[in-house]
Amino acid sequence: MTKKDYYHILGLDKDASPEDIKKAYRSLAKKYHPDISKEANAENKFKEVQEAYSVLGDASKKSNYDRFGDASDNGFSGFGGGGFDGFDSFGDSFFSSFGDIFGNQQTKKPSYDKKVEMTISFMDAVLGANKTIEITVEADCRVCHGKGAVSNQDVITCKRCGGNGQIITEQRTFLGNIRSRQVCPNCSGKGQEIKNKCYACHGQKRQKVKQSATFNIPAGIQEGMSLQVPGKGNFVPLSNNQKRRRSILLTFNSASS
């Protein structure tokens, strides 16, 4: 397979400095960006430019490419003939290192619980950027620490089910009386009820709080692309009384200039 000449794609000599590489990429990416260029093959050229910069703009990959003609450590091509992975469709999410790829996991329940739309500048879309945003998430109540009660003594055994979380109901039918188990409606199956509810969360155990989330926008992002950022969404209680945070899904709108 013919190796791509990334220096030629960016219009550079092999002794080009990092600043020269960045400057050439900035110019060509703006020229061929699909949201700007009217050329018929602009998208393919943009992908080539993006691919070239992803190698030459990274010191480690550039070193491998200069020595072996390939950016990967093992000497095999990391790109192949299919273009730059992750940018084949405006609607696809990308960069699996940020979490599951959205849109390709139709049978799975999404691991994110916050959707955020964000408008970024054109040059941030072309070159990438580090951003911090403020989001509202659900977390344990800061007053009762997730108990939902004024004190530990106010969390008592459910009087309806006796702490079992289930009740037995009996229904008369033409076949006779039928007994069945169902989730206790008083405690929702938890086996406990709250005598005096927390004044801050009103027994809900959770509150909405504002927190900051910092993430990297990959260079070359296009209109409508999404990025899944793990560990920045709502706090989710686990069965062992621990907590984990779900993801947020960022969808980008790029300013045209």
From Swiss-Prot:
Highest taxon above the source species: Bacteria
Gene3D superfamilies linked to this entry: DnaJ domain, Heat shock protein DnaJ, cysteine-rich domain, Urease metallochaperone UreE, N-terminal domain
Cofactor notes: Binds 2 Zn(2+) ions per monomer.
Entries under InterPro entries matching the protein: DnaJ_C, DnaJ_domain, DnaJ_domain_CS, HSP40/DnaJ_pept-bd, HSP_DnaJ_Cys-rich_dom, HSP_DnaJ_Cys-rich_dom_sf, J_dom_sf
CXXCXGXG motif repeats: 141-148, 158-165, 184-191, 198-205
Example GO molecular function: unfolded protein binding
Assigned GO CC terms: cytoplasm
Keywords: Chaperone, Cytoplasm, DNA replication, Metal-binding, Repeat, Stress response, Zinc, Zinc-finger
Binding annotation for Zn(2+) 2: 158, 161, 184, 187
Biological processes per GO annotation: chaperone cofactor-dependent protein refolding; DNA replication; protein refolding
Amino-acid positions noted as binding Zn(2+) 1 in the UniProt annotation, renumbered to this chain: 141, 144, 198, 201
Primary location group: cytoplasm
Subcellular location: Cytoplasm
CDD domains: DnaJ (cd06257), DnaJ_zf (cd10719)
Residue span(s) of domain J: 5-69
Zinc finger CR-type: from-to: 128-210
Listed cofactors: Zn(2+)
Family the UniProt entry places it in: Belongs to the DnaJ family.
Domain comment as written in the entry: The J domain is necessary and sufficient to stimulate DnaK ATPase activity. Zinc center 1 plays an important role in the autonomous, DnaK-independent chaperone activity of DnaJ. Zinc center 2 is essential for interaction with DnaK and for DnaJ activity.
Subunit-level organization: Homodimer.
PANTHER family the UniProt entry points to: DNAJ HOMOLOG 1, MITOCHONDRIAL-RELATED
Biological role stated in the UniProt entry: Participates actively in the response to hyperosmotic and heat shock by preventing the aggregation of stress-denatured proteins and by disaggregating proteins, also in an autonomous, DnaK-independent fashion. Unfolded proteins bind initially to DnaJ; upon interaction with the DnaJ-bound protein, DnaK hydrolyzes its bound ATP, resulting in the formation of a stable complex. GrpE releases ADP from DnaK; ATP binding to DnaK triggers the release of the substrate protein, thus completing the reaction cycle.
Official protein name in the record: Chaperone protein DnaJ
Source species of the chain: Onion yellows phytoplasma (strain OY-M)
Gene: dnaJ
